[in-house]
Amino acid sequence: MTECARCGICCEKGGPSFHTEDRMLIEKGKIPSKFLYTIRKGELAHDNVKGCLKPVDSDIIKIKGKEDSWTCLFFDEIRKGCAIYKGRPQECRVLKCWDTRELEQCYANARLTRKDLVSGVKGLWDLIEDHQARCDYNKIQPLIKDLTGVKRNRARQKLLEIIRYDAEIRNLVISRGGLDADMLDFLFGRPLTETLGNYGIKIQQEGTKIRLDRR
């Protein structure tokens, strides 16, 4: 094989990650931010090149999937085509499933971050930085480890505080800031109630009550 067969398998495995070369696609609105989500620094994520789950070194901004699947939001499953083909990101342009060398070379280089895109928005960027500091995965991982040790009660309390703050800041920017709810996963990453499953944590929420258990 030396050309794309339009099978759509690469699109069904998840949308691309963005690099600095893609910045204008977002800033000019060709790919609106509400269709994106952020894998935050330190978060466990699947490395598509190495084929394993590992903490990421920096923000990774990606296109959301369709509903509960990883299929890229812009993939037309009936026509087996891309809705943004002419303005597709760098990773989509260099990907050749029969020869992944070019993708492997650019995969971890010059990744686009939230700071690149929204650090100039006063107030909002302060909230993002505060959220990143208080919900840092480098703080969360030791607490998860301590859940099975002598420090488990303190660890559980601290972890619940972080999870509650993560939920509260999202509600706050919607109710008081009038922010579009679809922007939350881009600005603050995915909710901890979703991502902590990768760390073996099961979270159950009933109203304002949150319960967490080890799987």
Set out the residue ranges of the language-model regions.
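Hydrophobic scaffolds flanking metal-cofactor catalytic centers in soluble metalloenzymes
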Residues: 1-215
